[in-house]
Regions:
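Glycine-rich hexapeptide-repeat left-handed beta-helix
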Residues: 1-13, 45, 53, 59-60, ...
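A positional/architectural concept
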Residues: 11-65
Length: 187
């Protein structure tokens, strides 16, 4: 984690997980049970970024803002691997699929699914309870009650998963140590 001038990361959480190689810079607010996974970059260098409780930001995600366009990620949100979020708002209990892109001033409502590889252009409003697919993203249909249940389960899974990682993740320091402990065999 890094400060940038007066912009500082604010941890409002009793419990959270930020992977060692994730980068969190500037005005970023991390709430309870947030997990920020490996190689994610959260850059609050221009405007604040707030990440709601029980939200997970998966491996390789980039979150950034432009001046005058702060960012809000709601509670219980799942941001899939390699997604790109830029100056947008994501409602509670939504999922942004793998490699999706959401641009400045776009608003994704609550209980939404933005499919993998979808693009939500600048200023686009996605109503609550929508399934969005494509480039540019289009509302295909309303999400089902079963899908809403699964959105909640996804967020809960990542809360349990980060606790497992906090407890059990250990760095393997040197190859020599690995060989001595017979974790790997010699050639």
């Amino acid at each position: 984690m890094y400060s940038l001038g007066e912009r500082r990361v604010e941890i409002k959480a009793k419990d959270y997980f930020i992977a060692e190689n994730a980068t969190v810079i500037g005005s970023v607010i991390v709430n309870n049970n947030v997990s920020i996974w490996f190689n994610a970059v959260i850059r609050g260098d221009n405007e604040p970024i707030e990440i709601g409780e029980n939200t997970n930001i998966q491996d390789g995600v980039v979150v950034h803002t432009d001046e005058g366009i702060p960012m809000q990620i709601g509670q219980g949100v799942t941001i899939g691997h390699l997604a790109m979020l830029h100056g947008c708002t994501i409602g509670d209990n939504s999922l942004v699929g793998i490699n999706a892109v959401i641009l400045n001033n776009a608003r994704v409502g609550e209980n939404c699914i933005v499919g993998a590889n979808s693009l939500i252009p600048e200023g686009k409003e996605i109503p609550d309870g929508s399934l969005v697919l494509g480039t540019p993203g289009k509302v295909i249909r309303k999400v089902t009650d079963e899908e809403i249940k699964n959105l909640k389960l996804s967020a809960e899974h990542y809360v349990h998963n980060f606790k497992r990682f906090k407890e059990g993740l250990k760095r393997i320091e040197q190859l020599k140590d690995m060989q001595q402990k017979k974790i790997i065999g010699e050639d």
